[in-house]
Amino acid sequence: MVDEVEKPVSLEESKTNTREVEEEGEIVGESDDTMSSLGNPSMAMKHALEHSWTFWFDNPSGKSKQAAWGSSIRPIYTFSTVEDFWSVYNNIHHPSKLAVGADFHCFKNKIEPKWEDPVCANGGKWTMSFSRGKSDTCWLYTLLAMIGEQFDCGDEICGAVINVRVRQEKIALWTRNAANETAQVSIGKQWKEFLDYNDSVGFIFHDDAKKLDRAAKNRYSV
């Protein structure tokens, strides 16, 4: 892993410095036009990503035991350029600053971070665990690897989620075709390499998780 991430210069850096974060995962501007200004076509020389991506936030204060799973997840912002990614990323709380119980997602646009989404339905996820407050850098590197199309089997990737809990944080990388063992193992190995992560990581099918909950076993490990 490199010691420092070299961030592209944001063309809107002077604007984003004036934005405030109202709550975990939400950007608030001084006017209704704040968010739309991120995608202003008059801003020249932005670097387009291969896919558009959407940040989603699951606010722990909006959850209840009676509510259906995923009912409190809401989209935050969709970006499609390198510059807009940094504009958003630099103005939201990183995992170490999120409240316990929060889930923050980054998925390809039009894919919802839910098992029920048609693209995710037959998929699964790789998961890495970290001590509380220790996942910030690996979360960023995961995002950069995804949006930068660094995975050989990148078409298999749906998105990633960071789960913040009392004693630990977990980053999960969701993929679309769990039965494609070759692709999933390739993704798992590359992910570990990108993050310089030395512990074993496991892959669980969403279908197993739905049926067995925490009793679901890893189908693949790297």
Curated annotation (Swiss-Prot):
One of its GO terms (molecular function) is RNA 7-methylguanosine cap binding. InterPro entries: TIF_eIF4e-like, TIF_eIF_4E, TIF_eIF_4E_CS. The keyword Nucleus applies. Residues 1-35 are annotated as: Disordered. Disulfide bonds join 120-158. GO terms for cellular component: cytoplasm; eukaryotic translation initiation factor 4F complex; nucleus. Component of the protein complex eIF4F, which is involved in the recognition of the mRNA cap, ATP-dependent unwinding of 5'-terminal secondary structure and recruitment of mRNA to the ribosome. Recognizes and binds the 7-methylguanosine-containing mRNA cap during an early step in the initiation of protein synthesis and facilitates ribosome binding by inducing the unwinding of the mRNAs secondary structures. Key component of recessive resistance to potyviruses. (Microbial infection) Susceptibility host factor required for viral infection (e.g. potato virus Y (PVY) and pepper mottle virus (PepMoV)) by recruiting viral RNAs to the host ribosomal complex via an interaction with viral genome-linked protein (VPg). Residues 21-33 have a biased composition (Acidic residues). EIF4F is a multi-subunit complex, the composition of which varies with external and internal environmental conditions. It is composed of at least EIF4A, EIF4E and EIF4G. EIF4E is also known to interact with other partners. In higher plants two isoforms of EIF4F have been identified, named isoform EIF4F and isoform EIF(iso)4F. Isoform EIF4F has subunits p220 and p26, whereas isoform EIF(iso)4F has subunits p82 and p28. Keywords: Cytoplasm, Disulfide bond, Host-virus interaction, Initiation factor, Nucleus, Plant defense, Protein biosynthesis, RNA-binding, Translation regulation. SUPFAM superfamilies: eIF4e-like. Residues 1-20 have a biased composition (Basic and acidic residues). Strongly expressed in susceptible plants but not in resistant ones. Belongs to the eukaryotic initiation factor 4E family. Residues 47-50, 57-93, 141-150 are annotated as: EIF4G-binding. One of its GO terms (biological process) is regulation of translation. The lineage of its organism: Eukaryota, Viridiplantae, Streptophyta, Embryophyta, Tracheophyta. This is Eukaryotic translation initiation factor 4E-2. It is found in: Nucleus; Cytoplasm. According to the redox status, the Cys-120-Cys-158 disulfide bridge may have a role in regulating protein function by affecting its ability to bind capped mRNA. Displayed sequence is allele 1.
